[in-house]
Curated annotation (Swiss-Prot):
<dbReference type="GO" id="GO:0032968">
    <property type="term" value="P:positive regulation of transcription elongation by RNA polymerase II"/>
</dbReference>
<keyword id="KW-0597">Phosphoprotein</keyword>
<dbReference type="GO" id="GO:0005634">
    <property type="term" value="C:nucleus"/>
</dbReference>
<feature type="domain" description="OCEL">
    <location>
        <begin position="275"/>
        <end position="385"/>
    </location>
</feature>
<keyword id="KW-0539">Nucleus</keyword>
<dbReference type="GO" id="GO:0008023">
    <property type="term" value="C:transcription elongation factor complex"/>
</dbReference>
<feature type="compositionally biased region" description="Acidic residues">
    <location>
        <begin position="240"/>
        <end position="251"/>
    </location>
</feature>
<dbReference type="Pfam" id="PF07303">
    <property type="entry name" value="Occludin_ELL"/>
</dbReference>
<dbReference type="InterPro" id="IPR031176">
    <property type="entry name" value="ELL/occludin"/>
</dbReference>
<dbReference type="GO" id="GO:0042795">
    <property type="term" value="P:snRNA transcription by RNA polymerase II"/>
</dbReference>
<feature type="compositionally biased region" description="Polar residues">
    <location>
        <begin position="230"/>
        <end position="239"/>
    </location>
</feature>
<dbReference type="GO" id="GO:0032786">
    <property type="term" value="P:positive regulation of DNA-templated transcription, elongation"/>
</dbReference>
<comment type="function">
    <text>Enhancer-binding elongation factor that specifically binds enhancers in embryonic stem cells (ES cells), marks them, and is required for their future activation during stem cell specification. Elongation factor component of the super elongation complex (SEC), a complex required to increase the catalytic rate of RNA polymerase II transcription by suppressing transient pausing by the polymerase at multiple sites along the DNA. Component of the little elongation complex (LEC), a complex required to regulate small nuclear RNA (snRNA) gene transcription by RNA polymerase II and III.</text>
</comment>
<dbReference type="GO" id="GO:0048863">
    <property type="term" value="P:stem cell differentiation"/>
</dbReference>
<dbReference type="InterPro" id="IPR010844">
    <property type="entry name" value="Occludin_ELL"/>
</dbReference>
<comment type="subunit">
    <text>Interacts with AFF4. Component of the super elongation complex (SEC), at least composed of EAF1, EAF2, CDK9, MLLT3/AF9, AFF (AFF1 or AFF4), the P-TEFb complex and ELL (ELL, ELL2 or ELL3). Component of the little elongation complex (LEC), at least composed of ELL (ELL, ELL2 or ELL3), ZC3H8, ICE1 and ICE2.</text>
</comment>
<feature type="modified residue" description="Phosphoserine">
    <location>
        <position position="240"/>
    </location>
</feature>
Length: 387
């Protein structure tokens, strides 16, 4: 084969027997993910993979570290073409024939969550191939519907920068310092207290020794994680006279009406809608129960960080436009032009990122669930320190 790249050369053992129910996928890795898989193979540990619809998460355990990657599954050969997986059986006698294992119908693209990559990989460029090759969504109107062609953008962990810091909001850290650090997460919202990172259990252990200020008696739960805003959260109802029309697009999706409201992210559920985590996670009474809560916390927090990064990156453009339109007087030509621009960009956004509403609701749910679990853990630890 002429023009074959060096990365595609070499020999590989066929470790499975093709069968009728065998699914073949084209795997796309960036350099960080490839190195992590190689390290995992050297350590002879088994990775853990979890699917959630057309996306999922891959965890590669190792000695003293744990790599977490997200991935999406998309179709191959959407333009009428197709891809087949072939292999060549190398034998000492007889011709070396090519054998077709089957068609590659789906492609699995893996991105890295940089906060969980071991130290040797942190020096690598964290921009994935998808970041370098893909264009911004607002620069293209003719992209096919499906998964957003945008790579995961990393949101830094406030606790990862300094392992010796205490929890934000404690007596050993001024609130002003936390406000500055939290400003990059969200605008027009009170600073929120982050949760410990799932990258390392050691971080959580170090945070336990930090003094915690007592909350007011009526406020049992600590402030929650930073939460990504809606794409049009910067637009108030007064600034958006056409919001009812925006919410009724070609597919009749009326859920947009909720996301246009500034208060939509903070609306409390109705009394009859009791979240399941309130029933599942009650007051902690033992160390074993605390450990189980912490394990559940780590699992959900890994998913939350990925969703928060995706939702936050996607809505950043509309946050800027919302702040810009607030500075203009209603009824002026400038206000009308910008309003029309927001409408057009949002239509392109919905076409490019159809799963945004679903991911945002999931992110908000995890936001509240993790805050509830963390509050129970801190309450139990504070009770034990006092005894």
């Amino acid at each position: 084969m002429e023009g074959t790249q060096e990365a595609l050369s070499g020999k590989m053992r066929l470790l499975f027997t093709p069968a009728a129910r065998t699914s073949l996928l084209m795997l796309r890795l960036n350099e960080a993910a490839l190195r992590a898989l190689q390290e995992c193979q050297q350590q002879q540990v088994r990775p853990v993979i979890a699917f959630q619809g057309q996306r999922g998460y891959l965890r590669l355990p190792g000695p003293g570290w744990s790599c977490l990657f997200s991935f999406i599954v998309s179709q191959c050969g959407q333009e009428g073409g197709g891809l087949d997986l072939v292999y060549q059986r190398l034998g000492r006698s007889g011709p070396n024939c090519l054998h077709c294992l089957g068609s590659l119908r789906e492609r699995l693209t893996i991105w890295a969550a940089m906060d969980t990559i071991p130290a040797p990989l942190l020096a690598q460029e964290h921009l994935t191939e998808g970041t370098r090759e893909s264009e911004s969504w607002q620069d293209s109107e003719d992209e096919p519907e499906g998964h957003p062609q945008m790579a995961l953008q990393e949101v830094s962990d406030p606790l990862a920068s300094n392992h010796e810091q205490s929890l934000p909001g404690s007596s050993s850290e001024p609130m002003a310092q936390w406000e500055v650090r939290n400003h990059t997460y969200l605008s027009n919202r009170e600073p929120d207290q982050p949760l410990p990172s799932s990258a390392s259990q050691k971080r959580l252990d170090k945070k336990r020794s930090a003094p915690i200020t007592t909350e007011e008696p009526e406020e049992k739960r600590p402030r929650a994680l930073p939460l990504a805003s809606s794409p049009l959260q910067g637009l108030s109802n007064q600034d958006s006279p056409e919001e009812q029309d925006w919410g009724q697009d070609a597919d009749g999706d009326s859920r947009l009406e909720q996301s246009l409201s500034v208060q939509s992210a903070s609306e409390s559920p109705s009394p009859e809608e009791v979240p399941d985590y309130l029933l599942q996670y009650s007051t902690i009474h033992s160390a074993e129960q605390q450990q189980a809560y912490e394990q559940d916390f780590e699992t959900d927090y890994a998913e939350y960080r990925i969703l928060h990064a995706r939702v936050g990156a996607a809505s950043q453009r509309f946050t800027e436009l919302g702040a810009e339109i607030k500075r203009l007087q209603r009824g002026t030509p400038e206000h009308k032009v910008l309003e029309d621009k927001i409408v057009q960009e949002y239509k392109k956004f919905r076409k490019r990122y159809p799963s945004y509403s679903e991911e945002k609701r999931r992110c908000e749910y995890l936001h509240e669930k993790l805050s509830h679990i963390k509050g129970l853990i801190l309450e139990f630890e504070e009770k034990n320190r006092g005894s």
